[in-house]
């Protein structure tokens, strides 16, 4: 699958099409579960994480562990970007992203869905899940 095909599958609109960012945000924040939130969030980054990290890890690890490691590597890349900006190495984003990966796996194992709620409530829940993981990461660092 190419990047363009992946983005079209995730967003429902072609890569770079008018309104594609808005569609991505609507899909992500209005997602009916935490798993779906991450399915829709940043499809370009998700394509490369899936292709080069998650899928290769799946050959050797359970999917839940592969996804947590992939979240951690994504966080490490974000920390690296901050370091390259001259702000020093931070490990906060790595920890935060691992927390989000754990949260996603817990919500998946519990089969948590908020499909019966309005878009607004689903967005609040999705944003809250990120905020909760952020708070937990601050306790660890």
Descriptions of predicted regions:
Residues 1-74, 116-141:
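Membrane-interfacial catalytic/cofactor-binding modules of polytopic membrane enzymes
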Residues 76, 80-81:
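Active-site His/Glu-centered metal-binding helix of metallohydrolases
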Residues 82-118:
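Extended hydrophobic/aromatic segments used for targeting, binding, or gating
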